[in-house]
Design a protein with these regions (language model features):
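Extended beta-strand-rich architecture
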Residues: 16-19, 30-36, 47, 180-330
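Gram-negative/organellar outer-membrane beta-barrel architecture
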Residues: 1-202, 228, 257-264, 269-276, ...
Length: 363
């Protein structure tokens, strides 16, 4: 439901991708989670991206990537510059990124028995600048270290800088309209696969460095462990996700539980949002045809009672349960031009929800 085009201009390559997937979602009466802010103009239904790549910027195999991604309610601009180094040294990538997106997981308002989340009037404008160091791969392990300066500004739905949410509670750690921090991040990933199974594990650790007294100081970690196993004609995938944060914290840094990729049957963050979380997912897929699979799934998640520790306690104010279970069935369709996923889920409040997803669908 989209279009892709590549243009070569000298040594540079321009990739243009326009995706009209949301029009298909609208035709299936799947309502968007938050109102369209521009009055429903045609551009609001377009999801697109523009990417410019130069493989040899200064004649020494330096690579420059400039990309812009537009979603229904969010936008991201990314500039990445890579210069070659010997394989035994960490590969450097200098990154400048700016994004604007609605903050739904923590400040969103659950509706329809927690099956959807609406806008809470809080949006994040995030600017980051730093460097990524990709360590040489060792066996099945890869590692990335990054250090970045981040500046997060909080905006209302009409684009004004704000210090408090709709109920008068602070939306930043500093109490002003923005937070600043220098973040040192270490990420390690493990992956191993055979014909009948696969295993994946990732661990992220973030440390806020106190360069200035008003900047955030915190330690945050997150892990994801996934195991896939073939059971006759079927394939079972199970995963466990968890994390925690200590130290300074703004509400938008909380772990949001609920939604697609977390606990299906709930809206984004509708289960809870806390300083800690634990989410378990399992899915069994069965082949129906060569390109169509059926799926049965069970998800459960909890904020481990840490919702009350988030500044302003947004989860309690919105009546989030703190834990929840979702289960259901779905279809997975694979084609040369993309993947289609439809899930029919029910949450702990017996509210039924349809999740619809399309990836890499283009002409």
């Amino acid at each position: 439901m989209g279009a892709q085009k590549s243009i070569h201009a000298g040594k540079a390559k321009i990739d243009v991708n326009v995706d009209l997937t949301h029009k298909l979602c609208t035709s299936l009466m799947l309502l968007p989670p938050i109102p369209i802010r521009d009055g429903g103009s045609p551009l609001s239904l377009v999801i697109g991206s523009l990417c410019i790549k130069h493989p040899n910027l200064f004649g020494g195999s330096e690579k420059l990537d400039v990309s812009w991604d537009k979603g229904l309610y969010d936008s991201t601009v990314l500039v990445a510059y890579r210069r070659p180094r010997p394989e035994w040294l960490p590969q450097q990538c200098f990154v400048l990124q700016h994004s604007v997106s609605p903050e739904i997981g923590v400040h969103g308002t659950p509706v329809d028995n927690f099956s959807r989340s609406g806008s809470g009037g809080v949006n994040l404008s995030r600017l980051s600048l730093g460097v990524d160091l990709n360590e040489p791969a060792s066996s099945n392990w890869t590692s990335t270290t990054s250090i970045k300066f981040e500046h997060v500004n909080i905006l209302s739905d009409d684009g004004r800088s704000i210090t408090r949410d709709m109920e008068g509670f602070p939306v930043t750690c500093s109490g002003s309209t923005h937070d600043s921090m220098v973040v040192l991040k270490q990420e390690s990933r493990y992956a191993k696969a055979t014909n009948d199974s696969f295993s994946r594990f990732s661990m992220q650790i973030e440390q806020g460095i106190p360069v200035l007294s008003k900047w955030l100081i915190f330690n945050k970690f997150k892990f994801v462990a996934t195991k896939g196993l073939k059971l006759g004609p079927a394939f079972l995938v199970a995963s466990l996700t968890g994390g925690s944060i200590v130290g300074d914290m703004a509400p938008y840094q909380a772990f949001a539980v609920g939604g697609l990729g977390s606990v299906r049957g709930y809206g984004e963050g509708a289960v809870g949002s806390g300083r800690s979380c634990l989410v378990a997912n399992s899915e069994l897929t069965l082949p129906l045809t060569e390109t169509l699979n059926g799926a049965l799934f069970l998800d459960c998640g909890s904020d481990l009672g840490s919702g009350r520790l988030v500044p302003g306690n947004p989860a309690l104010r919105q009546g989030k349960p703190g834990s929840g279970t979702g289960f259901g069935y779905g279809l997975r369709y694979k084609s040369p031009i993309g993947h289609l996923q439809i899930d029919y889920a029910m949450n702990s409040f017996k509210q039924k929800t349809v999740f619809f997803g399309v990836s890499n669908l283009g002409l």
